Structures are given as structure tokens and as C-alpha cells.
Amino acid sequence: MSALVELENLTVRLLVEGELQTVLSDVSLTIAPGEALGLVGESGSGKSMTARSIARLLPAGAEVSGAIRYDGREVGELRGRDLRAYRGDVGFVFQDPRAHVNPVRQIGDFMTEALRLHDVSRADASRRAIAALADVGVKDGERRLGQYPHELSGGLLQRVMIAATLLTEPRLLLADEPTTALDVTTQAEVMAILDELRRDRGLALLFITHDLDLAGAVCDRTAVMYAGAVVETRDSDKLHSDPLHPYTAALAVARPRVDATAERLTTIAGRSQSAYEAPPACPFSPRCPHVQDRCTEERPPLRELDGGQVRCVRAEELRGDLAVSSHG
């Protein structure tokens, strides 16, 4: 199946403390129609910046090279009506819904705003908003439209935000850690909603998270990012059982387990780095337990291996060792 979204060697530079710095480096990804792709990594790895690049929500002054293609068209070249149509095709669900709503506006106002801009009547916009709320499991939609954000729990407000994105009937949903601020039970409910919507509507989903297990539970494939670069992309089940990159294996070991005690919790040595802080060769080399001299001398390309892609010069020789270590 051809890709709906394709990123090819995407590099983004932003002003950081007055200087242009690289925040994404040669990012290459694809998402097919109806596919869920997980994007996993520590804070600062470039996950959110990748989503914002796709949505064309980068700050002023950003320098972008490489390609972002949507349905075969170069996103950076879209203007006017074509750009508006593209933005209607892309829904964005943010981590903290309260940071993206006006606290003094009723739920119905911000839900129907986009529809009203397209000359949809108030009555029809409200009807469609109520239907969208029902699709995400929110009952008594008419009453909810008259409420304010502070009257809703975090989980309920996140459902409202998902419903609002559905009103433009997007083909691509960018979910940027949409469950991080929620309790475990509500997190599972929201994930089930996203997965059901994706399957029922054929949505392409980019699901951003720091949780490797969460991505594996709902995503067909998972891409792992470190220091602004993709270091591994693979079918989710294979990535969990047989990781190709030492960083993926380290994430697998560090994930919390139900039977873990304080003495048995594992962390990744060192600290995560942004793209402009990382060394020019392998960005993970300062923290990697398998580092050799050549790892610090050359920047590995993203290359094909065993049905996936990996950015590591030692990937073939380490495979067996990484598979064992990922299971603790």
C-alpha cells in the first residue's frame, strides 16, 4: 500500500537561545492509510517536533530541508486553499487538553468553530458535534456543549478534544502523548477510542509516546527516536522481541514492570541529548554499553535490516545479545 505520509531526510533547524540549532536530523518515516505508527523516545528526542513539522506548526524562522509528502504532494509547497484543505485533513490531539482550550468559552463554541468558518449553520454544527461526542463515548452531548472546560475531568476533556478533531473528517490523526496526564484506567479508555476510530474510519495514526509498551499495544509499527533522529523502525511485535538498536533494547529494559521493586528498577545510563547536543557520529554512543571506536568515528545511515530499518553500524553482530537483554 502506498504511503499517505512520507518523510524523507527531514531536517529542521530552530532558533535556540539566539542560535540556529538542528532539532531534527534526516528523519525518514512513512505512514500508510489506516496504519498506526508509534513514535517512541525520551523527552527531547524530537517526537513532538516531527508531528509539528507534519502539521506545519513550526515556529517562525524554522529552516526545513528534506521532504514531507502527503498523498504524494509536497506539504511545504501548499498554499491558500490547498493548505486549508490539508490542515482539514490533519487532526492534532495534544498532551494537555487544558492548555489548548479557552477556559471562558463553552465546549460547543470551540468544537463547532471550524465548521462555522465553512458556513455550516449553528444548528447543523451542534448536531454534528453531538454525534462526534457520541462516537468517543461522551453521553448527554447537548448538555456537554453548554459546559466549560473546568467542569470536565481530564479524561472527559481529552475525549472532547478528540471529538473536535473528528468534525473536519481528517484522514491523518497526530496524537502527541494524549494519555500522559491521565490515570491508568482513563488512559486505557482513551487508547481504545483512538484505536477504534482508526479501524472504523481508516485513519492513519501517528501515536507519540515515551512508553514502548503502549505503542506496541495499539500500533502496527513503531519508530524509535533519539537525539532528533530515527534509530529504528520495525513491526511493533518484532521491535519488542528482537530490537535491532541498543537504544531500543535499553528502553525495553528500563520500562517499569508490575513485579519490579525499587532495587530492580533499571535506568539508561547518562542523560538524553537533543540533536544539537549529541556527537556528530552515533548520537547514542556516549550512553551505549556496546560502543566501539568506529561508533564514534562515523554517523551510521538508516538502513534496511530484517524487514525494518536501523541506524547502527553493529546492528547485525548485536542482534542476539539485544534480544536477550530486552527481556531483562
Where are these regions (language model features)?
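P-loop NTP-binding/switch modules centered on Walker-like glycine-rich loops
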Residues: 56, 178, 182-263
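Conserved ABC transporter NBD signature motif
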Residues: 63-74
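Conserved ABC ATPase signature
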Residues: 147-152, 156
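Short catalytic/signature loops enriched in Gly
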Residues: 20, 139-145, 233-328
